[in-house]
Amino acid sequence: MTTQARPLQLGIAIAAALAGLALAGCNKPDTPPEQKVSAGTELDDAVITTKVKSALMTDNLGKGGDTSVETRKGEVMLSGFVDNQAQADREVQLAKAVDGVSSVQNKLMIKDGKSTAGAVLDDSVVTVKVKSALMTDDQTKGTEIAVTTNKGVVQLSGFVDSTDEQARATSVARNVEGVQSVVNDTSIKK
């Protein structure tokens, strides 16, 4: 009995080991790990950002001073508050015309009326407070999130690592005094 049972036990042990190895392969994350951006790509992105900002600042219709420009792997994100749809459309058109731009995300928001000097100052203070809160939070990369405020509405933009970081940034911003609402227009890094 022991001589015939041994091959059976050995076969069962081998099958169990192979099944364990097969199941171990199922424990992989759904999303591939983020590909690191090379120093050359970061430099290219910085040049693209500078060229887009320059194009926005020198255009008569666009008022690029109120527009945040973020670039990652040639993808440009425009965010902030503009006076009207024509200005937003023009800024997108200008960004698309810059050499090296592969695509443009339009996260520009239309202002709802004129702001008083006091309201602009209040918005500036809120922006600084939110930016500071994001910088000191250990779960967000505040240096990679742009913050713009108009009449207490805070817009977050830029490229973040995960949906968890997006949610955390929104939560941090909402808890800042003076924030009426938060629009999170960040995108997940590809």
Regions found by a protein language model. Name each.
Residues T2-K190:
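N-terminal targeting leaders
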